[in-house]
Amino acid sequence: MKSIMDRIRESGRVFVFGIAGDSGSGKTTISRGIKRILGEDMVCSFSMDDYHSLDRRQRAECRITPLHPQANHLDLLADHLEALRQGKGIDKPVYDHSRGEMAGTEPFGPAPVVIVEGLHPFFTERLRLAIDFKIFVDPSRSVKRLWKVRRDVGERGYQPEQVMAEILQREPDYKLYVDIQKIYAEMVVKIQDTRFHPSLPLAGPKPDWYSVRLIQEVMEQPVSPVDLNIDLSKILRSSEHEFSIEFQRDDYYGKKVGIMTVDGEIHQSMIAHLESRLCSSLGTCAEISDRRNEYVNAIGLAQLILTWNCTEKLEHLLGRGRASS
């Protein structure tokens, strides 16, 4: 049986995944994880930051934040996504974060899967129609603050007090223009501090532990069975790390959803079947999880589950394409 990747190549189609969320919310982490698992040759990605219509100086003069739709070329982005879906290359604008200025354009050609990440990928109906699978990343204020300070100070040359001031300035526009987009997402990824803080080490670096809640729209199409193997003997050993997994049904902005919450760190053996299913489905032997560590944190598991959802969505879209041809 042909793998999903082989079938996508043969179909000649281009599929677009959108990842929405605030600046510093972890969108790129999710995007890189999906790209690594699906394969570098199968996926290309870009940031909506490249579609700013105002540079940093102009935004300051106009007293407008990048989160305001008027500070972005949303129609141009829609034009480009529609062109990419047709297999056409584009001249994509480039935004230089180090200078806060536009830096011309660069050629950008589609791969079989295109990931667009940014503040407003679901803001207009035209954009939503151009995106096949929509993910919204929604960390808590404390997690987002930590990640944004770490990124903007370490990678973009800001001072910590500048980042904190910007976070406060942006909050109203985030609520008005970005947060609202999660009602259109098929998957919402909520990231919070772990509840296992009391058991974390008192000295040395703190483990990268989080609590991740995956809010997923109930799939209409049938999905492939996948097991999470739980070995009770491992759980009862004193060396076993703490973790929790829970699932519930709920309504989310008028949609029926399933909510899976993962916290702590999970042993690699528990995700072996999920990894095997992904490898078989994708037709790849690429590294799925980080084998340097015996345990996978909640974000790593969320990336696996997200990618499994992506493959199921691709299966559905490929099948629908055959039915309509």
Name the predicted role of every residue range.
Residues 27:
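Conserved lysine of the Walker
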Residues 7, 151-325:
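C-terminal accessory "lid"/substrate-recognition subdomains
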Residues 43-45, 134-136, 188, 259:
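Conserved beta-strand scaffold positions in the cores of enzyme catalytic domains, especially
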Residues 105-152, 201, 207-211:
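ATP-dependent NMP and nucleoside kinases share a basic, alpha-helical "lid"
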Residues 1-24, 32, 36, 41-45:
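Extreme N-terminal, non-catalytic leader segments
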Residues 50-53, 121-122, 140-144, 194-196, ...:
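Conserved nucleotide-binding/hydrolysis micro-motifs of P-loop NTPases
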Residues 49, 132, 186:
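Receiver (REC) domain switch/active-site residues of two-component response regulators
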Residues 41-47, 53-101, 113:
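Conserved nucleotide-sensing/catalytic segment adjacent to the nucleotide-binding pocket
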